[in-house]
Amino acid sequence: MGSIEIPNCSGSIVYKTISDFIDFPNHEQKLWWHSTAPMFAEMLRVAGYDLHSQYKILGIFLNHVIPFLGVYPTRINNRWLSILTRYGTPFELSLNCSQSLVRYTYEPINSATGTVKDPFNTHSIWDALDRLMPLQKGIDLEFFKHLKQDLTVDDQDSAYLLENNLVGGQIRTQNKLALDLKGGNFVLKTYIYPALKALATGKSIKTLMFDSVYRLCRQNPSLEAPLRALEEYVDSKGPNSTASPRLLSCDLIDPSKSRVKIYILELNVTLEAMEDLWTMGGRLNDASTLAGLEMLRELWDLIKLPPGMREYPEPFLQLGTIPDEQLPLMANYTLHHDQAMPEPQVYFTTFGLNDGRIADGLVTFFERRGWNHMAQTYKDSLRAY
């Protein structure tokens, strides 16, 4: 009788070769490497990165990112809980299927994170940036410095929050970094969560975010038109809306080329709500948007998100538990220079749903698009991961 070979990403030659030569500075970093690098290496291979790029990317990850992931998560250890995943882990890999582009996101953590020196992890991101900037030409921190100053807490804010016991179960992540991997190079991005700043100042997240970007527009007026259009859409939904701004991001490149993205969380998980996010309540009605709307409806039919009102759950899930929850919808709006309207992107939040059923729906969608290689390899890749 024949046997079925189940793919296993731990067999990656690149991962094994690098592993043979590592002298880990501590056990935590060793655990991080061996639990993340096999999947990372396999994703790079499947996405078509050449061998030289695979080694370079994994080398940067090993030497300049893993040192900022903190203690390796277990069920019993005391660790910083990151908003990046529902399990509080500070690292996540993702794949842009249509462009075969791998990305990873992480919340930088250091020895001061969560201590009296840095109770809300405000400062460790600077050390992480110091490690990354010499590795890639073109990194520019102008937008980041502006937004971080406006939207994350300083030491005075931190003291106020602690003295008045205002944080409680509030998620404490304030900023994280992402690397879009293009060949052996990367484009660096940041994500900023103003929830703690809102607590410290008494201002809404929406007010903080939009006011900060408007101030950014004083030196970059080409971003103002799409920002005003987005604000008008958000305000039109009224004070009792189920949709609200949650975070923003920007590219850490030349300000004249950097994009700002504003993210909206929608608690009402319905096709109608997602259509409203995609078209900005009918404000976007060009041919490209309408074509995307048809694809959105097709995906909704294939994935079958259970409808209903979904609050963002608290607290974090314990490692190893099977999720029995569904997350709200989310959309982001990219502000491009010299464009009148923002560009939407919507997220199908499938966390907590059956992976096999979701994979079947995606394979069907890939086949209909003519993405034959992705359709043929997607399930095997998931099994390998």
Swiss-Prot record:
The keyword Transferase applies. It holds the Pfam family Trp_DMAT. L-tryptophan binds at I83, L84, E92, Y193, R246. One of its GO terms (biological process) is indole alkaloid biosynthetic process. The keyword Acetylation does not apply. Pathway: Alkaloid biosynthesis; ergot alkaloid biosynthesis. It catalyses: L-tryptophan + dimethylallyl diphosphate = 4-(3-methylbut-2-enyl)-L-tryptophan + diphosphate. Tryptophan dimethylallyltransferase; part of the gene cluster that mediates the biosynthesis of fungal ergot alkaloid. DmaW catalyzes the first step of ergot alkaloid biosynthesis by condensing dimethylallyl diphosphate (DMAP) and tryptophan to form 4-dimethylallyl-L-tryptophan. The second step is catalyzed by the methyltransferase easF that methylates 4-dimethylallyl-L-tryptophan in the presence of S-adenosyl-L-methionine, resulting in the formation of 4-dimethylallyl-L-abrine. Homodimer. Belongs to the tryptophan dimethylallyltransferase family. This is Tryptophan dimethylallyltransferase.
